[in-house]
Amino acid sequence: MKPDIKICGLKTPEAIDRALKRGATHIGFIFFEKSPRYIEPDLAAKLAEPARGKAKIVAVVVDPTNDELDEIVSLLKPDILQLHGNESPEHVLTIKALYGLPVMKVFSVRTADDLKRVEAYIGIADRFLFDAKAPKGSELPGGNGISFDWSLLSWLDGSIDYMLSGGLNKNNVADALVKTRARGIDVSSGVETEPGVKSVAMIDEFFDAVETADAPVMAPGS
């Protein structure tokens, strides 16, 4: 069973085209203005059109207002909302009810205590994404090019569906898949020449590394 692969922080048609040709299952657009990967919703909507029906379109937001979500959902028409802020379980339920879209809830991880919060969202969020906690002083909640201790995920019940993120690149993604058996992986900075600038060559190298990985990806419910 191959893992889902999400290329996040996309901003150009060339990068999107290469991601789709290589088999990306998800493409992500970031609507957090402090990020170098930020994109205006109307431009994201235009860039996303070739992906419809080929990959899931993911809108990545950080503690958005209702007005911000209204604009993003109206223009982009995403398949999934990725919540990368401090959204409570109740807020996640409200967002799901308002927009009728599945939610992927992000948790920033440094220690085992960071994962204890997951339990309150089980049965509420449709999927989880585990990213490395941002270094002190960083304004970005993700996309910082750092990893966390993947062994912390070993306590998770096999029925918990998650994507692994945080510092993944061509050099470590195979090891990450073997050690975590994650059913999905998310990459952004690992396929960039500089923050916000995706490289089609690095996208190719990342997919090559995934394809050569001998990883027993965990099936749902196992």
UniProtKB/Swiss-Prot annotation:
Q: Which family does it belong to?
A: Belongs to the TrpF family.
Q: Which SUPFAM superfamilies match?
A: Ribulose-phoshate binding barrel
In terms of superkingdom, the source organism counts as Bacteria
Please give the NCBIfam families that the UniProt record associates with this protein.
PRK01222.1-1
The protein's annotated pathway: Amino-acid biosynthesis; L-tryptophan biosynthesis; L-tryptophan from chorismate: step 3/5
An MF annotation (GO) of this entry: phosphoribosylanthranilate isomerase activity
Disulfide-bond pairs as recorded: none
Its keywords, alphabetically, are:
Amino-acid biosynthesis, Aromatic amino acid biosynthesis, Isomerase, Tryptophan biosynthesis
Q: What are the EC numbers?
A: 5.3.1.24
Instruction: Look up keyword tRNA-binding and say if it applies.
Output: no
Q: Using the UniProt record, name the top-level EC class of this enzyme in a single word.
A: isomerase
Write down the Pfam families for this protein, in alphabetical order.
PRAI (PF00697)
Q: Which residues form the signal peptide?
A: none
**Keyword Nucleus (UniProt):** no
Its UniProt entry gives the catalysed reaction(s) as: N-(5-phospho-beta-D-ribosyl)anthranilate = 1-(2-carboxyphenylamino)-1-deoxy-D-ribulose 5-phosphate
Query: Record's InterPro entries?
Result: Aldolase_TIM (IPR013785), PRAI_dom (IPR001240), RibuloseP-bd_barrel (IPR011060), TrpF_fam (IPR044643)
Instruction: Give the record's GO biological process terms.
Output: L-tryptophan biosynthetic process
Q: What is the official name of this protein in its record?
A: N-(5'-phosphoribosyl)anthranilate isomerase
